[in-house]
Amino acid sequence: GTTGRSVLATPMELAADGGAWKNLNFEITKHKQGAIAWKALNQNDRFLMDLEGQMESDGNIEYKVTLIAREDASVQDVALQTHLASGIGRYMMGLGEKGGYWPNDFSWKWNVEKNQDAVWVGDVNAGIQIRLYDNKYERPLNTNFYHQKPLHMPVSWCNGGNGGIDIHNTADGTSINAYSGKRSVKKGDRLYYYFNLAL
């Protein structure tokens, strides 16, 4: 049919210590048939956010987010929070799940041996894939030979094993929380939270 479905119940958010983000600058850097790209500078009380994004007509969206610490601090968490609309979170594939009905509550932690960095959650003709990476990303081998070139663990997302992904049913949809956990930062430290979406 021609009637679309809303995948998200609310806008996705990269939430971090320091409160709400305030936009300082926004610029369209590419606008052509099939693709648009932009960059933005945001800040909160704890971090400066340098963001580059690109969206293509096939539903692929790439975000490269660099957080720069504005002060020495103990950080509770930086997390990509996604809330799917009711009825969208029916099936799941990735993070060790082979594909099928999703298990209602799911928790996953980074582990280089598992060679996993992406999840898809959705319904028939509607869903979202989220892949997490960083500024040193190298495409892993996804065949029987992947042990010869293991996954490059994204340092900011993994955070020494503190990071992971929780997926839960809520009263009005499904929540996906890709978290990185507690860490200490020094003023000027850079954290690279890159992610790719396929809708």
PLM ranges: what are they?
Residues 2-25, 30-31, 42-43, 74, ...:
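Beta-strand-rich recognition/accessory modules
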Residues 36, 78, 119:
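A broad, low-specificity signal marking well-ordered, structured residues that form hydrophobic/aromatic
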Residues 56, 60-109:
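Acidic (Asp/Glu-rich), glycine- and aromatic
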